């Protein structure tokens, strides 16, 4: 095989690998409470109604009744329970997300710092791993 053929094949393989990565949609708001999480949940319902395998990976409702109500009817991946400094805390279960392989996963609180000892220090790093697994993320 000539070098030219190899380069062409390698470029094509790189393109295939790139296309297998998940797509990332992010909601940005000017301040807390403007409706980012609410809008993500509305979108999740629309996707589900259209036959898309969408799951909730992590949502923080901040005890807002309207936001909590929007979780009704959406499949939720259970959070991973971890103990840290004597307290039980809930975290995104990145491995469960990757194992379940939904078409789309909703992940809130992108800037969150993970509990020490995890693979990634920040939730946004978890999202990158999920995208590399070919799962689309809305955050």
Task: Map each language-model feature to its residues.
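N-terminal pre-Walker A segment at the start of P-loop NTPase domains
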Residues: 1-15
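Conserved P-loop
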Residues: 7, 11, 20-95, 99
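ASCE RecA-like P-loop NTPase motor cores
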Residues: 23-25, 130, 138
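Loop/turn-to-beta-strand initiation segments
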Residues: 53, 101-104, 133-139
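Conserved nucleotide-binding/hydrolysis micro-motifs of P-loop NTPases
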Residues: 60-65, 104, 111-112, 137
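Charge-rich, low-complexity amphipathic helices
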Residues: 69-70, 119-120, 128
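Conserved ATPase-coupling elements of RecA-like P-loop NTPase cores
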Residues: 109-124
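Conserved catalytic/switch belt of AAA+ P-loop NTPases
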Residues: 125-132
């Amino acid at each position: 095989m000539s070098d030219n053929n190899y380069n062409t094949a390698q470029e094509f393989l790189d393109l295939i690998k790139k296309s297998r990565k998940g797509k990332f949609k992010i909601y940005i708001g000017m301040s807390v409470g403007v409706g980012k999480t609410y809008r993500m949940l509305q979108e999740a319902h629309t996707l589900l109604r259209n036959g898309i395998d969408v799951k909730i990976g992590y949502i923080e409702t901040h005890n807002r009744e309207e936001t909590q109500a929007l979780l009704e009817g959406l499949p939720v991946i259970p959070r991973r329970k971890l103990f840290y400094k004597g307290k039980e805390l809930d975290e995104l279960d990145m491995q469960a997300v990757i194992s379940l392989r939904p078409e789309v996963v909703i992940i809130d609180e992108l800037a969150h710092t993970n509990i020490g000892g995890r693979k990634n220090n920040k939730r946004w790093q978890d999202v990158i791993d999920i995208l590399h697994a070919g799962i689309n993320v809305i955050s």
